[in-house]
Design a protein with these regions (language model features):
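Conserved GNAT acetyl-CoA-binding A-motif
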Residues: 128-129, 157-171
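Conserved acetyl-CoA-binding loop-helix of GNAT-fold acetyltransferases
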Residues: 128, 132-136, 141-157
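Conserved beta-strand-loop-alpha-helix junction that forms the acyl-donor binding cleft
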Residues: 1-2, 136-141, 167-177
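Conserved active-site tyrosine of GNAT-family acetyltransferases
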Residues: 180-181
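Short catalytic/ligand-binding loop motif for oxyanion handling, primarily in non-cytosolic enzymes
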Residues: 4-8, 90, 100-101, 176
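Residues at or immediately flanking beta-strands
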Residues: 25, 54, 164-166
Length: 184
């Protein structure tokens, strides 16, 4: 086990408890069905984020643009969906930290950056990741679904040889997200 895995092993029991008590399952996103996955993601995103400071619902154009931009770097195991009876109730969006691909690219050459990024992604040598978004439907908050998603992300990131994660984009005034991250 890596240090990453050992530090957070307590989340296993929480995830198991949430699954057995509530019948919630977590699955990977499906890159081959990207359009439908984005639709499912947006249903939860708009409801989960509507009360966050500064939230503005994304337009269809923005969603399409983001999906096209993220598709080359998305690792399906790091974009989990939590489901209850086949309905999405929560999601996570974790992306590789591409800053490591920028290191050594002082020339600023786009082709070199893209080649290095592609190589790092294919050889699983990106050791860092960033939690970009986490969204849970309001009626499922406080029931451990966040712990279940964090557990999934931690486990799958470890399988990708990731040893470090960052949630620096988390809104400072989101006590639920802060508490979940601090418990990890």
């Amino acid at each position: 086990n890596s240090t990453f895995d050992n530090r957070f092993s307590g989340s296993d029991a929480v995830a198991d408890k949430v699954e057995s008590e509530h019948g919630i399952t977590v699955r990977n996103s499906d890159k081959s069905d990207l359009g439908a996955e984005i639709g499912r993601f947006m249903e939860v995103y708009n409801e989960a984020w509507e009360k966050n400071w500064g939230f503005i619902p994304m337009t269809d154009h923005e969603i399409d643009h983001l999906a096209k931009s993220f598709k080359p770097v998305v690792i399906p195991e790091l974009v989990p969906f939590a489901e209850k009876d086949g309905q999405i109730i929560a999601f996570g969006l974790v992306l590789p930290d591409l800053n490591s691909a920028l290191v050594g690219n002082r020339s600023g050459g786009l082709l070199r950056f893209l080649a290095k990024t592609f190589w790092l992604l294919k050889t699983q040598r990106l050791r860092r990741c960033r939690i970009i978004l986490l969204g849970i439907l309001p009626e499922w908050r406080g029931r451990g679904v966040d712990a279940m998603l964090y557990h999934w992300i931690r486990t799958k990131a470890g399988e990708q040889n990731t040893s470090w994660g960052d949630a620096g984009w988390s809104v400072e005034d989101n006590p639920s997200m802060k508490a979940g991250l601090e418990k990890m």
